[in-house]
Amino acid sequence: MVMAVYRCAKCGKEVELDLENTREVRCPYCGSKILYKPRPRVARRVKAI
């Protein structure tokens, strides 16, 4: 069982989906097909040249 957390583009709610058993990826709240993988809240520091 692979559970993944996504954020809906239309309503903005976080959705947890089982990708192995689900054929169609949709938001269960609004029915939107556009889901984004949320980025981690860790700030990255890049060394300037």
Curated annotation (Swiss-Prot):
Record's GO cellular component terms: cytoplasm; DNA-directed RNA polymerase complex
Residues reported to bind Zn(2+): C11, C27, C30
Cofactor binding, per record: Binds 1 zinc ion.
Intracellular or extracellular location(s): Cytoplasm
Keywords: Cytoplasm, DNA-directed RNA polymerase, Metal-binding, Nucleotidyltransferase, Transcription, Transferase, Zinc
Main location: cytoplasm
EC number annotated for this UniProt entry: 2.7.7.6
Record flagged with keyword Transcription: yes
GO biological process terms held by the UniProt record: DNA-templated transcription
GO molecular function, one term: DNA-directed RNA polymerase activity
Swiss-Prot/TrEMBL catalytic activity: RNA(n) + a ribonucleoside 5'-triphosphate = RNA(n+1) + diphosphate
Swiss-Prot/TrEMBL cofactor(s): Zn(2+)
Cross-referenced InterPro entries: RNAP_P/RPABC4, RPABC4/Spt4, Rpo12
Keyword Transmembrane attached: no
Subunit structure: Part of the RNA polymerase complex.
General function of this protein: DNA-dependent RNA polymerase (RNAP) catalyzes the transcription of DNA into RNA using the four ribonucleoside triphosphates as substrates.
NCBIfam families: PRK00398.1-4
Record family assignment: Belongs to the archaeal Rpo12/eukaryotic RPC10 RNA polymerase subunit family.
Protein name (Swiss-Prot/TrEMBL): DNA-directed RNA polymerase subunit Rpo12
Organism this protein belongs to: Thermococcus onnurineus (strain NA1)
Lineage of the organism: Archaea, Methanobacteriati, Methanobacteriota, Thermococci, Thermococcales
